[in-house]
Amino acid sequence: MDIPLICNDSALSQKAKILRKKWGFLSTQSDHFQLHLLPEYLALEQKDDPKQGLVFVDFVSGSVAHRRKFGGGKGQAIAKAIGLKPGVQVDVIDATAGLGRDAFVLASLGCNVTMIERSAVAAALLEDGLERAYLNLEIGTWMKQRMRLHFGSASEYLQHHQTGVVYLDPMFPHKKKSALVKKEMRVFQGVVGEDLDADSLLEAALNAARYRVVVKRPDYAPFLNDKKPTMSIKTKKNRFDVYVKQAMPQNKS
């Protein structure tokens, strides 16, 4: 999908040119999806449905910051699924990074997270969010140490990189009338689409992970690739299917 990047601020015009060249974005207007380079952030808009609002990556404030401060720490479901233990620093590849929220939670809990994203739109939004977060006095230092982004195919990356844990959260068709599907996710999914190769990605993840693979699924979704997990950790909306290969180490992974 060809996505234009619109910039109406002359002070940002050079940056807009750099981003268009780097990511292959267009400079013409669109009747459907388009990116906006604003002084505050890079944002995605569904132009034919403006009520959906702008989608951007924010690791500093809003719901992500609230989750970091009050989300339950290592007692929350995602931490249990990853297998976090006191004194153990886990290397994680988030092979379906999306808007980076789960990756951020894991990094805030001490994991070293490499986010993989093959969508140029998603990767550009993530990079913009990371750059702003790196400058933040409260979280910037550990963000630089623990969160990084790789743009490209997750399957290819996993063929050449081993890690402690691989985390997968592939796009899955939501129930049409589900109130759980947030507006911004509807916009985001409209651009990146479904992960039709998610089943094969599980096998690549199992080959790359030393300790386990964690797959986040809607509570109504079948197991990825119809492969039964070692265990599942359920939440109100989702579940984490955990495929254990071997026990976590008692010290640094």
UniProtKB/Swiss-Prot annotation:
<feature type="binding site">
    <location>
        <position position="169"/>
    </location>
    <ligand>
        <name>S-adenosyl-L-methionine</name>
    </ligand>
</feature>
<dbReference type="GO" id="GO:0008990">
    <property type="term" value="F:rRNA (guanine-N2-)-methyltransferase activity"/>
</dbReference>
<comment type="function">
    <text>Specifically methylates the guanosine in position 1516 of 16S rRNA.</text>
</comment>
<comment type="similarity">
    <text>Belongs to the methyltransferase superfamily. RsmJ family.</text>
</comment>
<dbReference type="Pfam" id="PF04445">
    <property type="entry name" value="SAM_MT"/>
</dbReference>
<keyword id="KW-0698">rRNA processing</keyword>
<dbReference type="GO" id="GO:0005737">
    <property type="term" value="C:cytoplasm"/>
</dbReference>
<dbReference type="InterPro" id="IPR029063">
    <property type="entry name" value="SAM-dependent_MTases_sf"/>
</dbReference>
<keyword id="KW-0963">Cytoplasm</keyword>
<keyword id="KW-0949">S-adenosyl-L-methionine</keyword>
<feature type="binding site">
    <location>
        <begin position="101"/>
        <end position="102"/>
    </location>
    <ligand>
        <name>S-adenosyl-L-methionine</name>
    </ligand>
</feature>
<keyword id="KW-0808">Transferase</keyword>
<protein>
    <recommendedName>
        <fullName>Ribosomal RNA small subunit methyltransferase J</fullName>
        <ecNumber>2.1.1.242</ecNumber>
    </recommendedName>
</protein>
<dbReference type="InterPro" id="IPR007536">
    <property type="entry name" value="16SrRNA_methylTrfase_J"/>
</dbReference>
<keyword id="KW-0489">Methyltransferase</keyword>
<feature type="binding site">
    <location>
        <begin position="117"/>
        <end position="118"/>
    </location>
    <ligand>
        <name>S-adenosyl-L-methionine</name>
    </ligand>
</feature>
